[in-house]
Swiss-Prot record:
Enzyme class: hydrolase
Subunit-structure text: Monomer.
Single GO molecular function: GTP binding
Residues binding Mg(2+), per UniProt: T26
UniProt entry keywords in alphabetical sequence: Cytoplasm, Elongation factor, GTP-binding, Hydrolase, Magnesium, Metal-binding, Nucleotide-binding, Protein biosynthesis
UniProt-annotated stretches for the region G4: 131-134
Record protein name field: Elongation factor Tu
An example Gene Ontology CC term for this record: cytoplasm
Gene for this chain: tuf1
Family annotation (Pfam families): GTP_EFTU, GTP_EFTU_D2, GTP_EFTU_D3
Length: 391
């Protein structure tokens, strides 16, 4: 049977459900597919397969659906630890999120934690679904819960006053009853998501960046750098910079090859070889990046949000303390760095997610939101994301 062709006639947005355990994330996901996609039953979504991202095993369910304006890929995770790991590793990129809050409970510890994580890992916006409203008889109580959610969002620098909060019942929508809080609430929610979560800039429209994977010298032609273009476009004749590890160098791309064919350009997603003018083979190494001049700077100090693997996940068996010195694997290479723990944090246990500062021994081309693995002698012991660059 021929595979269904992916129609790219609508903008594509990646989204996910977040929120406290048992507040109805998976039921809501199922309800959205009932009205906007190929219906997926609750247990189909909940029995999510495991996948590996940056050496970490995560269970995530992926569903897709579309509104009149957009195509959505939606991720839902069965357990809280899976959410933390997913958000930190960026295994399933989220351009926006639907925060699910049970109206009877109001915001709970994981509600807060997911909002904070969203802020740290750079989820730009959220829309709120206030679920299980049929379990609350008092209209004033609903208003209080809504206020509480808005204040919580504002306290983490989200626009709490402007974020749409949609009351409803995912279960009513699933069971096809009480349309006002069922089907209509789901439709209102998706209208809010359509309107409030911005369409992300496509990778190809962003400034050019390619991590260096390998470097060759071709006699009579010069130095060729290979890698996969992460974003943007490179044209023959473009000026580019080589950033990271050593001092930044400027050069011109004099040729682009793909599968040994000469091209006039390479774009996001392509595996290419770029021929660089006047650059010695020794001057470029794996771990640097080629990029549009001035678009990315090298840094050594940053703050990070990280998840530390448990022993069962193949991680450390013991906690680590201040001045822990693992390797930080950025894009294509390991760089040693020293960890500075926050005041009041004595140690970090396997299974924790934690914020800390890092100082690398060599500069790396980095931006806020860049993901990395934490490794010890080639073994992954954690994953993290740059939440703030300090130097």
């Amino acid at each position: 049977m021929a595979k269904a062709k992916f129609e790219r006639n609508k903008p594509h947005v990646n989204i996910g459900t977040i929120g406290h355990v048992d507040h109805g994330k998976t039921t809501l996901t199922a309800a959205i597919t009932k009205y906007f996609g190929d219906f997926q039953a609750y247990d189909q979504i909940d029995g999510a397969p495991e996948e590996k991202a940056r050496g970490i095993t995560i269970s995530t369910a992926h569903v897709e659906y579309e509104t009149e304006n957009r195509h959505y890929a939606h991720v839902d995770c069965p357990g809280h630890a899976d959410y933390v790991k997913n958000m930190i590793t960026g295994a399933a990129q989220m351009d926006g999120a639907i925060l699910v809050v049970n109206a009877a409970d109001g915001p709970m510890p994981q509600t807060r934690e997911h909002i904070l994580l969203g802020r740290q890992v750079g989820i730009p916006t959220m829309v709120v679904f206030m679920n299980k409203v049929d379990q609350v008889d008092d209209e004033e109580l609903l208003e209080l819960v809504e206020m509480e959610i808005r204040e919580l969002l504002s306290s983490y620098d989200y626009p709490g006053d402007d974020i749409p909060v949609i009351p409803g019942s995912a279960l009513a929508a699933m069971e096809g009853r009480d349309p006002e809080i069922g089907e209509e609430a789901i439709k209102k929610l998706m209208a809010a998501v359509d309107e409030f979560i911005p369409t992300p800039e496509r990778a190809i429209d962003q400034p050019f960046l390619m991590p260096v994977e390998d470097v060759f010298s071709i006699s009579g032609r010069g130095t060729v750098v290979t890698g996969r273009v992460e974003r943007g476009v490179i044209n023959v004749g473009d000026n580019i910079e080589i950033v990271g590890i050593k001092d930044t160098q400027s050069t011109t791309c004099t040729g682009v090859e793909m599968f040994r064919k000469l091209l006039d350009r390479g774009e996001a997603g392509d595996n290419i070889g770029a021929l660089l003018r006047g650059i010695d083979r020794e001057a470029v190494e794996r771990g640097q990046v080629l990029c549009k001049p001035g678009s990315v700077k090298p840094h050594t100090k940053f703050e990070a949000e990280a998840y530390i693997l448990t022993k069962d996940e193949g991680g450390r068996h013991t906690p680590f303390f201040a001045n822990y010195r693992p390797q930080f694997y950025f894009r294509t290479t390991d760089v040693t760095g020293t960890v500075q723990l926050a005041e009041g944090t004595e140690m970090v246990m396997p299974g924790d997610n934690v914020s800390f500062g890092v100082e690398l021994i060599a500069p790396i081309a980095m931006e806020q939101g860049l993901r990395f693995a934490i490794r010890e002698g080639g073994r992954t012991v954690g994953a993290g994301v740059v939440s703030k660059i300090t130097e």
